[in-house]
């Protein structure tokens, strides 16, 4: 069986997990409420502030799904209790960002400003014009939003200009010599 799938998910105080028909799991916490439908190859059981996931049979797919379901459930529990954040840095002359409500205005060297509409459940802060902090309870959605923003102007390998994750390393190339 999957090593990750064997580990139980500890449920902190203030977080409740409801398992409905069809493996629809709803996690409620102080920050948000998340729900997801999981594969029917796994079974969820919640008792004494601990959730366990077991595969319905010993097929390779069911065992793999148990590990995946455990990791996703763990992220949901952490998201509704603590939340997640992702930081982006903008590098380049004249490149900047400004958060306005549920929109993010990006000036990235195009002839027009790029306006990115944030999905529900994700908030953005811009403590500096070249720094974006994205926060949310859903780790998957947060990563998707950060990836979409980065996609507008990926870091280029010669000068490093563009939007990058805070912990991202951009390998620099040497310019062509005559």
Swiss-Prot record:
Gene3D superfamilies named in the record: Ribosomal protein L6, alpha-beta domain (3.90.930.12)
Keywords annotated in UniProt: Ribonucleoprotein, Ribosomal protein, RNA-binding, rRNA-binding
Pfam family, any one: Ribosomal_L6
RNA-binding is among the record's keywords: yes
Signal peptide bounds: none
Gene Ontology molecular function, alphabetical: rRNA binding; structural constituent of ribosome
Gene Ontology terms describing biological process: cytoplasmic translation
Gene Ontology cellular component terms for the protein in this record: cytosolic large ribosomal subunit
Family note: Belongs to the universal ribosomal protein uL6 family.
Protein purpose: This protein binds to the 23S rRNA, and is important in its secondary structure. It is located near the subunit interface in the base of the L7/L12 stalk, and near the tRNA binding site of the peptidyltransferase center.
Subunit structure: Part of the 50S ribosomal subunit.
Stated name of the protein: Large ribosomal subunit protein uL6
């Amino acid at each position: 069986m999957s090593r990750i799938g064997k580990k139980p998910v500890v449920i902190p105080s203030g977080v409740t997990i409801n398992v409905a028909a069809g493996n629809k799991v709803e996690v409620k916490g102080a920050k948000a409420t998340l729900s997801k439908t999981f594969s029917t190859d796994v079974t969820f059981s919640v008792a004494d502030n601990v959730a366990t996931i077991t595969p319905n049979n010993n097929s390779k797919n069911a065992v793999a799904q148990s590990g995946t379901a455990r990791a996703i459930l763990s992220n949901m529990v952490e998201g509704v209790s603590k939340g997640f954040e992702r930081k982006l840095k903008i590098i380049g002359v004249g490149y900047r960002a400004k958060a306005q409500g549920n929109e993010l205005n990006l000036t990235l060297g195009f002839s027009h400003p790029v306006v990115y509409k944030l999905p529900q459940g994700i908030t953005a802060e811009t403590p500096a014009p070249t720094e974006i902090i994205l926060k949310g309870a859903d780790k998957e959605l947060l990563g998707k939003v950060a990836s979409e923003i980065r996609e507008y102007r990926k870091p280029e390998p010669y000068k490093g200009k563009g939007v990058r994750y805070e912990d991202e390393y951009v390998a620099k190339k040497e310019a062509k010599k005559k």
